[in-house]
Amino acid sequence: MITNRQQSILNAIVEDYVDYGLPVGSKTVIERHQVNVSPATIRNEMKILEGMGLIEKAHASSGRSPSIKGFRYYVDQLLENTSPRTEFNNQRLNKLLADYNYNLSNALSVYANELSMSTKYTTLIMKPNQSKDLITDVHLFNTVAHLVIMVIVFESGNVEHLQLAVPEKISKNRLVQIANYIKSIFNADMRNDFSDETFMHSNDYLIVNQLIDLLNQRLNDITTDIFFGGKANLIDTLNEQNVNSIQQILQYLESNKILKLFEDDNHSGIDVKIGQEIDNGLEDISIILSDYHIDNHLKGHVAVIGPTAMRYQNVIQLLYKV
Protein backbone atom coordinates (compact mmCIF):
# COMPACT_ATOMS: atom_id res chain seq x y z
CA MET A 1 0.00 0.00 0.00
CA ILE A 2 1.36 3.42 -0.88
CA THR A 3 0.61 6.78 0.73
CA ASN A 4 -1.67 9.40 -0.80
CA ARG A 5 1.35 11.54 -1.68
CA GLN A 6 3.09 8.62 -3.34
CA GLN A 7 -0.11 7.88 -5.26
CA SER A 8 -0.26 11.50 -6.44
CA ILE A 9 3.36 11.35 -7.59
CA LEU A 10 2.79 8.04 -9.37
CA ASN A 11 -0.28 9.50 -11.09
CA ALA A 12 1.75 12.53 -12.19
CA ILE A 13 4.55 10.35 -13.59
CA VAL A 14 2.14 8.06 -15.46
CA GLU A 15 0.08 10.90 -16.95
CA ASP A 16 3.11 12.99 -17.96
CA TYR A 17 4.84 9.98 -19.46
CA VAL A 18 1.71 9.16 -21.48
CA ASP A 19 1.34 12.77 -22.67
CA TYR A 20 4.99 13.51 -23.50
CA GLY A 21 6.69 10.12 -23.88
CA LEU A 22 9.66 11.22 -21.75
CA PRO A 23 10.96 10.27 -18.28
CA VAL A 24 9.60 12.55 -15.56
CA GLY A 25 11.81 14.32 -13.00
CA SER A 26 11.00 15.81 -9.60
CA LYS A 27 11.05 19.38 -10.91
CA THR A 28 8.52 18.48 -13.62
CA VAL A 29 6.18 16.92 -11.06
CA ILE A 30 6.23 20.10 -8.96
CA GLU A 31 5.80 22.50 -11.89
CA ARG A 32 3.07 20.64 -13.77
CA HIS A 33 1.08 19.27 -10.85
CA GLN A 34 1.51 21.96 -8.18
CA VAL A 35 2.76 19.49 -5.57
CA ASN A 36 3.46 21.58 -2.47
CA VAL A 37 6.65 19.84 -1.30
CA SER A 38 10.36 20.28 -2.00
CA PRO A 39 12.18 18.61 -4.91
CA ALA A 40 14.20 16.62 -2.37
CA THR A 41 10.99 15.17 -0.89
CA ILE A 42 9.73 14.26 -4.36
CA ARG A 43 13.05 12.55 -5.16
CA ASN A 44 12.86 10.59 -1.92
CA GLU A 45 9.30 9.46 -2.67
CA MET A 46 10.40 8.50 -6.19
CA LYS A 47 13.12 6.27 -4.73
CA ILE A 48 10.48 4.53 -2.61
CA LEU A 49 8.21 4.04 -5.64
CA GLU A 50 11.21 2.74 -7.60
CA GLY A 51 12.03 0.31 -4.79
CA MET A 52 8.45 -0.98 -4.99
CA GLY A 53 8.88 -1.60 -8.71
CA LEU A 54 6.23 0.97 -9.71
CA ILE A 55 8.59 3.28 -11.62
CA GLU A 56 11.93 2.83 -13.37
CA LYS A 57 14.97 5.09 -13.71
CA ALA A 58 15.91 5.99 -17.27
CA HIS A 59 19.56 5.28 -18.12
CA ALA A 60 20.38 8.66 -19.66
CA SER A 61 18.13 10.79 -17.48
CA SER A 62 17.41 11.56 -13.87
CA GLY A 63 13.73 11.15 -14.60
CA ARG A 64 11.53 8.12 -14.01
CA SER A 65 9.05 6.26 -16.20
CA PRO A 66 6.22 3.93 -15.12
CA SER A 67 6.87 0.19 -15.08
CA ILE A 68 4.22 -2.33 -16.16
CA LYS A 69 3.53 -2.84 -12.45
CA GLY A 70 3.14 0.93 -12.09
CA PHE A 71 0.66 1.13 -14.95
CA ARG A 72 -1.26 -1.76 -13.39
CA TYR A 73 -1.42 -0.02 -10.00
CA TYR A 74 -2.46 3.27 -11.61
CA VAL A 75 -5.24 1.61 -13.62
CA ASP A 76 -6.54 -0.38 -10.64
CA GLN A 77 -6.87 2.81 -8.59
CA LEU A 78 -8.54 4.53 -11.53
CA LEU A 79 -11.14 1.77 -11.87
CA GLU A 80 -11.68 1.62 -8.11
CA ASN A 81 -12.42 5.35 -7.95
CA THR A 82 -14.75 5.36 -10.96
CA SER A 83 -18.45 5.18 -10.14
CA PRO A 84 -20.23 2.13 -11.61
CA ARG A 85 -22.62 2.64 -14.48
CA THR A 86 -26.32 2.76 -13.71
CA GLU A 87 -27.52 3.63 -17.24
CA PHE A 88 -26.96 1.15 -20.05
CA ASN A 89 -29.04 2.67 -22.84
CA ASN A 90 -26.66 3.84 -25.56
CA GLN A 91 -28.37 6.79 -27.22
CA ARG A 92 -25.72 7.24 -29.94
CA LEU A 93 -25.86 3.59 -31.01
CA ASN A 94 -29.66 3.64 -30.97
CA LYS A 95 -29.59 6.69 -33.26
CA LEU A 96 -27.16 4.97 -35.64
CA LEU A 97 -29.46 1.94 -35.77
CA ALA A 98 -32.36 4.19 -36.74
CA ASP A 99 -30.22 6.04 -39.31
CA TYR A 100 -29.19 2.76 -40.95
CA ASN A 101 -32.70 1.26 -40.98
CA TYR A 102 -31.83 -1.05 -38.08
CA ASN A 103 -29.05 -2.79 -39.97
CA LEU A 104 -26.90 -3.66 -36.96
CA SER A 105 -23.77 -4.48 -38.98
CA ASN A 106 -23.74 -1.08 -40.70
CA ALA A 107 -24.44 0.76 -37.44
CA LEU A 108 -21.67 -1.06 -35.54
CA SER A 109 -19.16 -0.50 -38.35
CA VAL A 110 -19.78 3.26 -38.18
CA TYR A 111 -19.79 3.18 -34.38
CA ALA A 112 -16.38 1.43 -34.28
CA ASN A 113 -14.90 4.21 -36.44
CA GLU A 114 -16.52 6.91 -34.29
CA LEU A 115 -15.08 5.42 -31.09
CA SER A 116 -11.67 5.17 -32.70
CA MET A 117 -11.79 8.83 -33.70
CA SER A 118 -12.82 9.80 -30.15
CA THR A 119 -10.16 7.73 -28.37
CA LYS A 120 -7.39 8.06 -31.02
CA TYR A 121 -6.80 4.31 -30.62
CA THR A 122 -7.83 1.19 -32.49
CA THR A 123 -11.34 0.07 -31.57
CA LEU A 124 -12.94 -3.34 -31.90
CA ILE A 125 -16.65 -4.05 -31.52
CA MET A 126 -18.12 -7.53 -31.32
CA LYS A 127 -21.69 -7.98 -32.45
CA PRO A 128 -24.13 -9.12 -29.74
CA ASN A 129 -25.07 -12.76 -29.47
CA GLN A 130 -28.35 -12.54 -31.33
CA SER A 131 -29.37 -16.05 -30.34
CA LYS A 132 -30.78 -14.24 -27.30
CA ASP A 133 -32.52 -11.62 -29.45
CA LEU A 134 -36.13 -12.65 -30.03
CA ILE A 135 -37.36 -12.79 -33.63
CA THR A 136 -40.54 -10.73 -33.70
CA ASP A 137 -41.38 -10.83 -37.39
CA VAL A 138 -40.50 -12.60 -40.65
CA HIS A 139 -41.44 -11.39 -44.13
CA LEU A 140 -40.97 -13.16 -47.48
CA PHE A 141 -40.95 -11.43 -50.87
CA ASN A 142 -40.67 -12.65 -54.47
CA THR A 143 -38.19 -11.11 -56.88
CA VAL A 144 -38.14 -11.25 -60.67
CA ALA A 145 -35.21 -13.70 -60.75
CA HIS A 146 -36.87 -16.60 -58.91
CA LEU A 147 -35.41 -15.46 -55.63
CA VAL A 148 -37.22 -15.26 -52.31
CA ILE A 149 -36.04 -12.51 -49.98
CA MET A 150 -36.48 -13.21 -46.26
CA VAL A 151 -36.52 -10.18 -43.94
CA ILE A 152 -36.07 -11.00 -40.25
CA VAL A 153 -36.97 -8.41 -37.61
CA PHE A 154 -35.55 -8.79 -34.10
CA GLU A 155 -36.85 -7.43 -30.80
CA SER A 156 -33.78 -5.16 -30.58
CA GLY A 157 -34.85 -3.50 -33.85
CA ASN A 158 -32.10 -5.15 -35.88
CA VAL A 159 -33.13 -6.29 -39.36
CA GLU A 160 -31.42 -9.07 -41.34
CA HIS A 161 -31.93 -9.99 -45.02
CA LEU A 162 -31.45 -13.42 -46.59
CA GLN A 163 -32.24 -14.79 -50.04
CA LEU A 164 -33.01 -18.21 -51.50
CA ALA A 165 -33.27 -19.34 -55.13
CA VAL A 166 -36.55 -21.17 -55.84
CA PRO A 167 -37.64 -23.15 -58.93
CA GLU A 168 -40.84 -21.17 -59.44
CA LYS A 169 -42.60 -18.07 -58.23
CA ILE A 170 -44.52 -18.54 -54.97
CA SER A 171 -47.88 -16.89 -54.42
CA LYS A 172 -48.20 -14.09 -51.88
CA ASN A 173 -50.60 -16.14 -49.73
CA ARG A 174 -48.16 -19.05 -49.57
CA LEU A 175 -45.31 -16.69 -48.71
CA VAL A 176 -47.33 -15.29 -45.80
CA GLN A 177 -48.09 -18.82 -44.55
CA ILE A 178 -44.44 -19.87 -44.81
CA ALA A 179 -43.26 -16.67 -43.09
CA ASN A 180 -45.70 -17.16 -40.20
CA TYR A 181 -44.62 -20.77 -39.80
CA ILE A 182 -40.92 -19.85 -39.74
CA LYS A 183 -41.67 -17.13 -37.20
CA SER A 184 -43.43 -19.70 -35.02
CA ILE A 185 -40.33 -21.92 -35.06
CA PHE A 186 -38.21 -19.15 -33.54
CA ASN A 187 -40.84 -17.47 -31.36
CA ALA A 188 -42.10 -19.49 -28.40
CA ASP A 189 -45.24 -17.34 -28.10
CA MET A 190 -46.49 -18.59 -31.49
CA ARG A 191 -45.62 -22.29 -31.33
CA ASN A 192 -49.13 -23.39 -30.41
CA ASP A 193 -50.51 -21.81 -33.61
CA PHE A 194 -48.64 -24.22 -35.89
CA SER A 195 -47.74 -27.89 -35.76
CA ASP A 196 -44.58 -29.39 -37.26
CA GLU A 197 -46.84 -31.20 -39.73
CA THR A 198 -48.24 -27.98 -41.19
CA PHE A 199 -45.88 -28.19 -44.16
CA MET A 200 -44.77 -31.81 -43.77
CA HIS A 201 -46.69 -33.02 -46.82
CA SER A 202 -46.68 -29.72 -48.67
CA ASN A 203 -44.84 -28.86 -51.88
CA ASP A 204 -43.26 -26.07 -49.85
CA TYR A 205 -41.62 -28.46 -47.35
CA LEU A 206 -38.19 -28.28 -49.01
CA ILE A 207 -38.31 -24.48 -49.31
CA VAL A 208 -39.38 -24.11 -45.67
CA ASN A 209 -36.48 -26.25 -44.48
CA GLN A 210 -33.99 -24.41 -46.68
CA LEU A 211 -35.15 -21.07 -45.29
CA ILE A 212 -34.94 -22.37 -41.71
CA ASP A 213 -31.42 -23.70 -42.37
CA LEU A 214 -30.41 -20.33 -43.84
CA LEU A 215 -31.75 -18.51 -40.81
CA ASN A 216 -30.05 -20.87 -38.34
CA GLN A 217 -26.78 -20.48 -40.21
CA ARG A 218 -27.08 -16.70 -40.15
CA LEU A 219 -27.88 -16.69 -36.42
CA ASN A 220 -24.73 -18.72 -35.79
CA ASP A 221 -22.61 -16.49 -38.03
CA ILE A 222 -23.68 -13.17 -36.57
CA THR A 223 -22.69 -14.10 -33.03
CA THR A 224 -18.99 -13.59 -33.86
CA ASP A 225 -19.04 -10.64 -36.27
CA ILE A 226 -16.26 -8.17 -35.43
CA PHE A 227 -15.90 -4.56 -36.57
CA PHE A 228 -12.65 -2.58 -36.41
CA GLY A 229 -12.15 1.15 -36.28
CA GLY A 230 -8.83 2.90 -36.83
CA LYS A 231 -6.48 -0.06 -37.28
CA ALA A 232 -3.86 2.40 -38.55
CA ASN A 233 -3.86 4.04 -35.11
CA LEU A 234 -1.83 1.08 -33.83
CA ILE A 235 1.04 2.15 -36.06
CA ASP A 236 0.62 5.81 -35.11
CA THR A 237 0.60 5.19 -31.34
CA LEU A 238 3.37 2.59 -31.18
CA ASN A 239 6.79 4.14 -31.75
CA GLU A 240 9.81 2.68 -33.54
CA GLN A 241 10.88 0.79 -30.41
CA ASN A 242 7.60 -1.15 -30.52
CA VAL A 243 7.73 -2.34 -34.15
CA ASN A 244 7.64 -5.98 -33.06
CA SER A 245 4.54 -5.27 -30.97
CA ILE A 246 2.71 -3.92 -34.03
CA GLN A 247 3.19 -7.19 -35.87
CA GLN A 248 2.34 -9.24 -32.77
CA ILE A 249 -0.90 -7.40 -32.01
CA LEU A 250 -2.05 -7.50 -35.64
CA GLN A 251 -1.48 -11.26 -35.70
CA TYR A 252 -3.29 -11.54 -32.37
CA LEU A 253 -6.32 -9.66 -33.68
CA GLU A 254 -6.40 -11.53 -36.99
CA SER A 255 -6.32 -14.88 -35.17
CA ASN A 256 -9.46 -13.85 -33.24
CA LYS A 257 -7.73 -14.69 -29.94
CA ILE A 258 -9.37 -11.58 -28.58
CA LEU A 259 -12.67 -13.49 -28.62
CA LYS A 260 -11.27 -15.70 -25.87
CA LEU A 261 -10.19 -12.59 -23.97
CA PHE A 262 -13.83 -11.48 -23.93
CA GLU A 263 -14.99 -14.96 -22.93
CA ASP A 264 -12.48 -15.16 -20.07
CA ASP A 265 -13.33 -11.68 -18.80
CA ASN A 266 -15.55 -11.99 -15.73
CA HIS A 267 -16.00 -8.26 -15.17
CA SER A 268 -19.46 -6.82 -15.72
CA GLY A 269 -18.13 -3.30 -16.26
CA ILE A 270 -14.79 -2.09 -17.62
CA ASP A 271 -11.62 -4.18 -17.41
CA VAL A 272 -8.06 -3.42 -18.48
CA LYS A 273 -5.50 -5.99 -19.65
CA ILE A 274 -1.86 -4.89 -19.78
CA GLY A 275 1.05 -6.56 -21.55
CA GLN A 276 1.39 -10.28 -20.91
CA GLU A 277 -2.03 -10.32 -19.26
CA ILE A 278 -3.19 -10.29 -22.89
CA ASP A 279 -0.72 -12.72 -24.46
CA ASN A 280 2.99 -13.47 -24.67
CA GLY A 281 4.90 -10.98 -26.78
CA LEU A 282 2.45 -8.12 -26.17
CA GLU A 283 4.38 -6.38 -23.36
CA ASP A 284 3.87 -2.96 -24.97
CA ILE A 285 0.11 -3.32 -25.54
CA SER A 286 -2.95 -2.59 -23.40
CA ILE A 287 -6.56 -3.47 -24.11
CA ILE A 288 -9.52 -1.84 -22.37
CA LEU A 289 -12.61 -4.08 -22.43
CA SER A 290 -16.22 -3.08 -21.90
CA ASP A 291 -19.79 -4.03 -22.77
CA TYR A 292 -22.37 -2.10 -24.74
CA HIS A 293 -26.11 -2.58 -24.64
CA ILE A 294 -28.93 -2.25 -27.13
CA ASP A 295 -32.34 -1.56 -25.59
CA ASN A 296 -30.96 -2.76 -22.23
CA HIS A 297 -31.36 -6.44 -23.11
CA LEU A 298 -28.93 -7.21 -25.95
CA LYS A 299 -25.25 -7.08 -24.97
CA GLY A 300 -22.11 -6.94 -27.09
CA HIS A 301 -18.44 -6.24 -26.40
CA VAL A 302 -16.08 -3.39 -27.20
CA ALA A 303 -12.30 -3.15 -26.89
CA VAL A 304 -9.92 -0.21 -27.22
CA ILE A 305 -6.37 -1.25 -28.13
CA GLY A 306 -3.26 0.86 -27.70
CA PRO A 307 0.19 1.09 -26.11
CA THR A 308 0.76 0.54 -22.39
CA ALA A 309 1.30 4.32 -22.23
CA MET A 310 -2.37 4.85 -23.02
CA ARG A 311 -4.63 7.70 -21.90
CA TYR A 312 -6.53 5.31 -19.65
CA GLN A 313 -8.63 7.90 -17.85
CA ASN A 314 -9.97 9.43 -21.07
CA VAL A 315 -10.82 6.05 -22.60
CA ILE A 316 -12.44 4.68 -19.44
CA GLN A 317 -14.59 7.80 -19.05
CA LEU A 318 -15.69 7.50 -22.68
CA LEU A 319 -16.48 3.78 -22.37
CA TYR A 320 -18.65 4.44 -19.33
CA LYS A 321 -20.98 6.23 -21.75
CA VAL A 322 -21.10 3.23 -24.11
From Swiss-Prot:
What organism is this sequence from? Staphylococcus carnosus (strain TM300)
Taxonomic superkingdom: Bacteria
Q: Name one Pfam family in it.
A: HrcA_DNA-bdg
Q: Which UniProt keywords apply?
A: Repressor, Stress response, Transcription, Transcription regulation
Family label: Belongs to the HrcA family.
> What is the name listed in the Swiss-Prot or TrEMBL entry for this protein?
Heat-inducible transcription repressor HrcA
The record, for HAMAP family, names: HrcA
Against InterPro entries, the record matches this protein to: GAF-like_dom_sf, HrcA, HrcA_C, WH-like_DNA-bd_sf, WH_DNA-bd_sf, WHTH_HrcA_DNA-bd, WHTH_transcript_rep_HrcA_IDD
